[in-house]
């Protein structure tokens, strides 16, 4: 046994506030930071809800404007609209409220403002490795108030879709990381069950792919294994129970989402994520749903490549793991995850999600490009293998 060697990159996240009723701390958080002109970003559904009134009420006079046009997969046009609104009120901060779409919309718009250029035009369809360039060094504080489990609020990377090609790219910069995250499970009670579950599967996918990444670390393995265990225990109960019980389970799911992606900029994510990044915008499939579809197949693929790294996954799933029979245990983990997904009313195949089989080869190249740039798989993954995995996930 040798001593651990490496390095760990921390983001600029400063505070995570969690628990029922904690949205009421938002005003004090803005005051503490001296922020007076915050723009809140959300989608059309939450934009019509009383929950938005609760959030803006907590902000008080510090709410300068509300943008309610965030949309799935972050179309570049919505980013430009938000950027214009933030410039109009000379925003000093942005509050994202909802799931991954408003969170990423806020990040990419912030990138446009901080760099004095349209950040959507330079987004790259890879692993978000290209840092945002330029700007005058100023800050634009982002506070995230998530209502799903996609966990994008824990990274400084934001995805955006080019509407002309339906290819998703992204931007990354330490300044894009939300500085404060407020996890109030009460705000998730109106999240549709299918969306809550699907984003929970996205968190599960984060944890699984962090563990078998070649960039995995002891810290990320430990937290990812705990995330898996928490999701297995609490995700089903979170939608089957009501009232205080549901809040308890939802709060544990929010902790799982946090743990699943802790250190994600160190581990990065692999084949399932790369597929999801392109399946989503191409066929308008929510990213949580893409994880429901691709994760078990990619786990079986990785069982042949890196079975020795499935130990923490097995721990989280309650599967007996023996290094002498690692591949069999890894395959059992994949089966266990597929069975777990099957209990929920979400699409389980690409066919169920409305994907056109004859179009599958069209995304092989951008998926391959992301995998190659991420460099988290032990060996190269070729286009034929990508297409074979997508075909397996079709039905």
Where are these regions (language model features)?
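C-terminal charged capping/lid subdomain of soluble metabolic enzymes
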Residues: 320-395
